[in-house]
Amino acid sequence: MSLRSSYSVRSSTSQVPVSQMSQMSQMSIKRTTNVPTYRAARSTAAAGQGTRISSASYSGVRSGVGLPSMSSSIHVSATGATGDIMGNEKMAMQNLNDRLASYLRSETLEQANSKLELKIREALEKKGPEVCDYSRFQPIIDDLRRKIFDATSNNARLVLQIDNARLAADDFRVKYDSELSIRQGVEADIAGLRKVIDDTNMNRMNLESEIEALKEELIFLKKNHDNEVMELRNQISHSGVQVDVDAPKGQDLAKIMEEIRSKYEKMALKNQEELKAWHESQITEVQVQVIQNTEALEGARTEVNELRRQIQTLEIELESQRNLKGSLEATLRDTEMRYNMEIESLNAVTMQLEAELTQLRNNIQHQTQEYEALLNLKMKLEAEIATYRRLLDGGDFKLQDALEEQKRVKVMTVTQTLVDGKVVSSSTETKEKKF
C-alpha cells in the first residue's frame, strides 16, 4: 500500500516569517470596515508638476480563523506649488489629521496582525501538523495477507485433491469398463458352454434311445431264434418216417443245429459285447465331456462371483469417491464464498483508507491555499504598514514607495511515496511567484 504525501516549503525575498499550518477549525467572522480615503501631499523637486499616486485596495480574505474585510486607499497628491501648501494652515492641519488617522489605522492593523499571528501560533501549538500514521494498520494488513496466502494454499491443495480424486475416479471407471467387458465375455462363454451342454445332453439322449432300440432288437432276435429252434425241434420230434438204407450214416442234424445255435449265440454275444463296449465308450466320452463342461461351468461361476464381488467393491469405492468429491466441492464453494466475503471486506477497508487519504490530501491542499492567502495578506499588510510608517516618519516619498511592492515567493513542493512506512521515491518542484 503506497501513501503519497505532499507538503510545501515557501521562501520569500522579503523578510516575512513563514509558519506551517495544520487543520484549523473553520470560523466565519465577517466584519466590514469602511476606511475613508487618505491624501498625503508632499513637495517634489519639479515645481508646477502634479503627481497622483494610488495604492492597491485589499479585499477581505476568509480563512480558518477569519479576517475582517478591509478596504483601504491611499491617495497622495502633490502639487508643484510648495509655497501654497506651506502657507495654507487649513491644508496643513488637514494633512496632520490625515497623518494621525493613518497612524491610528496602522496601529490597528498591527494589532490585528499580531492577534492573527497569535491565533495561528496557538492553533499550530494545539493541533500541530496532522500526519496520518498508517503503521497501526500494518499488523492488520500483514494478518490479512497471511490469511489470503493460507487461503490460496488451501485452495490449491483442494484443487490438487480434487484433480487426484478425478483421476482416481477415471481409473476406476476404466477398470470398471474393462471388468464389465470381461464379465460380458465370460457370460458369452457361459452361454456357449450351456449350449454345448444342451447339445451333449441331446446326444446322450439319442444314444440312450438307440441303445434301447438295439436292446429291443436283440430281444426280438433272441425270441425269433428260440421260436425257430422250437419249430425245428417240433418238426424233428413229430417226424415219424424212418428210412433204413444201406447208405453211409449222414450228418447228425441235432449236432448241426447245436453248432448253428452256438454259432448264432457267439455272434449274438459278440454283437452284444461290441454294442456294450461301444455304448460304454460313448457314455465314457459323454461323461468326460460332461465333467469337463461341469468343471468349466464351475470355474466360470466362480469367476463370475469373483467379478461380481469386485464390481460391488468398485461400486462402493466409486460411491465413496463421489461422496468425497461432493464434500470437497462443497468445502471449496464454502471456502470461496468465505474468502470472497473477506476480500470484499478488505476492499471496503481499502476504499475507506483511500477515501481518508483523499480527504487528508484535500485538507492539506485547502490548508495550503489558506496559508498562501494569509501569507499574501500578511505581506500586503506589512507593506501597507511600512508605507504608513514612512509617511508618519516624514521620510522621502518617492513614486516607487507608493506603488505596490513586488515580492517574490518561492514555493517548493516535495512529493514523497511511502510504502510500508518507508520512503521509496521523492521529487521536488520549485515555483516562484511575484506579489
From Swiss-Prot:
The keyword Repeat does not apply. Residues 89-399 form the IF rod domain. Residues 1-36 are annotated as: Disordered. Residues 141-232 are annotated as: Coil 1B. Residues 395-435 are annotated as: Tail. The keyword Phosphoprotein applies. Residues 257-394 are annotated as: Coil 2. Keywords: Coiled coil, Intermediate filament, Keratin, Phosphoprotein. GO terms for molecular function: structural molecule activity. It comes from the Eukaryota. SUPFAM superfamilies: Intermediate filament protein, coiled coil region. Residues 89-123 are annotated as: Coil 1A. Residues 233-256 are annotated as: Linker 12. Abundantly expressed in an even distribution throughout the optic nerve, localizing specifically to the astrocyte domains. Moderately expressed in spinal cord, brain, liver and oocytes. GO terms for cellular component: keratin filament. InterPro entries: IF_conserved, IF_rod_dom, Keratin_I. Heterotetramer of two type I and two type II keratins. Keratin-18 associates with keratin-8. Belongs to the intermediate filament family. There are two types of cytoskeletal and microfibrillar keratin: I (acidic; 40-55 kDa) and II (neutral to basic; 56-70 kDa). This is Keratin, type I cytoskeletal 18. The lineage of its organism: Eukaryota, Metazoa, Chordata, Craniata, Vertebrata.
